[in-house]
Swiss-Prot record:
The lineage of its organism: Bacteria, Pseudomonadati, Pseudomonadota, Gammaproteobacteria, Enterobacterales. It comes from Proteus mirabilis (strain HI4320). It holds the Pfam family UPF0270. Transmembrane segments: none annotated. This is UPF0270 protein PMI2817. Belongs to the UPF0270 family. InterPro entries: UPF0270 (IPR010648), YehU-like_sf (IPR036685). NCBIfam families: PRK04966.1 (NF003438). Gene3D superfamilies: YehU-like.
């Protein structure tokens, strides 16, 4: 189930994004980005619709994923 990011408080959204970024450990290429930059990048993707917040009832957790990969079950 998609969670509308706009309905979350700024603090909650930032905490979810930060948790996601720390969990992912994504490689950002030749130049390492700060945590703040990574959080800002993910937030931009949510705002643009490239990424979505997803609640998994099975795992009882929230994840961020590319909108193109989201398949509602």
């Amino acid at each position: 189930m998609i969670i509308p990011w706009q309905e979350l408080s700024t603090e909650t959204l930032d905490n979810l994004i930060e948790s996601f970024v720390l969990r992912e450990g994504t490689d950002y290429g030749m130049q390492e980005k700060t945590l703040e930059q990574k959080v800002a990048d993910v937030k931009k993707q949510l705002v643009s619709g490239e990424a979505v917040l997803v609640w998994s009832e099975l795992h009882e957790s929230v994840n961020i994923m590319p909108a193109a990969q989201f398949r509602p079950d």
